[in-house]
Amino acid sequence: VKELFNSLVELGQHPKEMADTVTVMEKIGHFLDDEVTDLYQECKNNGLSKREASPVIAEKLPVAKILKRASKGWDGGYAMAGLFGHGVAFVLRDPSGIRPAFWYEDDEVCVVASERPVIQTAFRLKYDQVKELTPGSALIIKKSGKVSELKINEPRELKSCSFERIYFSRGNDYDIYAERKNLGKLVVDQVLKAVDYDLDNSVFSFIPNTAETSFYGMIKGLEDYLNDKKYQAILDLGANPAPEQLQEIIYQRARIEKIAIKDAKLRTFITQDDARDDLVAHVYDITYGSVVRGKDN
């Protein structure tokens, strides 16, 4: 922010405060003024009056160029939406794709949101009908209704926000759901090592509620591990295994319980740090009897 603030001062601007929103708006405003001034001078040279020049400037105003010049030097994640006075709206996404952005257009509306499922649900759409805004690009919506996605900045290495995808995003997104399930499968080896492969005395659950999808993936991974273990155990029994031995092997499964119960009306995430620990004690409760005290992992 300080770097952007100083660059504005060097350009002759006087931002009212050193805040990211203010400096970004001032930056866009500065280059907007530049382009308007140049276009007005062109109109004036062609003998147009101020009244006659206004619609010409509105029509020729290079929004993509303004965004490119203004966003030079920006870093971090953003999906920035704005509306110019002559009726052109835009959404600009960061080149690394840190912040998500999706859009949909038909003959009536153009909508942009940070999550695909909200657009799918609101407009009853299929997965492939909603487009992802390309990192470094801007969606520009003109007053006439024309919509175009234009490259503003060169895309960089994709660095999607892990907090956004793993914790905060809606779990019913096609990609997010698959990603969270896969994450659960990937931790299975570490979980098994942590409980010393003792599934008989280990109880598996999840917390917080957003971990549920990953939990399903972890259980699938545990089931795969158990199936391989059962298969080998049955082979080791030989040609004529006793029914009791087969039954003991086949009925082995991971112990799954709903251990932690959360009050849906309370949220720890938005709580001040100094009050969060106290609030957690009231937000979460335990299902008594689901764990054998002093024995279960």
Could you describe each region identified by the protein language model?
Residues 139, 212-213, 259:
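Internal hydrophobic scaffold segments of catalytic domains
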Residues 189, 193, 220, 224, ...:
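Conserved helix-loop functional segments at active or binding sites
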Residues 223-297:
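Short, glycine/charge-rich flexible loops or terminal/linker lids adjacent to PRPP-binding catalytic cores
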Residues 145-161, 206-240:
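Terminal amphipathic helices with adjacent charged low-complexity linkers/tails
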Residues 2-134, 140-202, 207-208, 293:
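Conserved short alpha-helical segments that host acidic/polar catalytic motifs at enzyme active sites
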Residues 28-29, 89-92, 213-216, 265-271:
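Short, solvent-exposed polar/charged micro-motifs at secondary-structure junctions
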